[in-house]
Design a protein with these regions (language model features):
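Mid-sequence helix-capping/hinge segment at a functional interface
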Residues: 1-19, 23
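Nucleotide-sugar donor-binding patch of glycosyltransferase catalytic domains
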Residues: 55, 65, 93-146
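Short, flexible loop segments at the rims of nucleotide/cofactor-binding pockets, characterized by
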Residues: 17-19, 61-65, 126
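Short glycine-centered, acidic/aromatic-flanked micro-motifs in structured strand/loop junctions
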Residues: 12, 42-44, 126
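Tryptophan-centered motif/residue detector
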Residues: 16, 21, 26, 44, ...
Length: 146
């Protein structure tokens, strides 16, 4: 997986269900990236997240479900990525600390209170996660990876 460039990372999992973005939107976003020749890498931290990553990647050749990674290994993946898309998770803050372009998706959580800071940090927000569309995310991501 390390030899293919460029790539983006999707942090698709978080601890609270209301902070998850619908899998259909992740799939739609992944499919939109096909035309850009950008690989999508999906990390995971537990078996539930691994199962989600496999569902998101199913049947798509430009998607890699990463092996279980340490935090240092994950930081290396972030450091070499073109951009990151994440739900509200601590890994979004790690991305900000590494100054990588990041789009964080927020539902009921107010990003002005707990959001990531830095010039490369972007966020999309709605009163519910399912109201954020893959089209909105793709429009922003497309600008970041050009």
């Amino acid at each position: 997986a390390d030899s293919i460039e460029p790539y983006v990372i999707f942090f698709h999992s978080t601890t609270r269900d209301e902070k998850h973005w619908p899998e259909r939107e992740w799939r739609n976003l992944i499919e939109k990236l096909t035309a850009l020749s950008v690989q999508v890498r999906l990390p995971w931290g537990n078996e539930k997240e691994k199962a989600r990553a496999k569902r998101l990647a199913k049947g798509l050749s430009h998607v890699v479900v990463l092996p279980k990674l340490s935090l240092n290994e994950l930081a290396d993946q972030i450091a070499n990525a073109k951009a990151v898309v994440s739900v509200d998770t601590g890994l979004a803050h790690l991305t900000a600390a590494l100054d990588k372009p990041n789009i964080t998706l927020y539902g009921a959580t107010d990003p002005t209170l707990i959001g990531c800071y830095g010039q490369n940090q972007h966020y999309l927000t709605a009163d519910a996660m399912e109201k954020i569309t893959s089209g909105q995310v793709f429009s922003t991501l497309n600008l970041l990876i050009k």
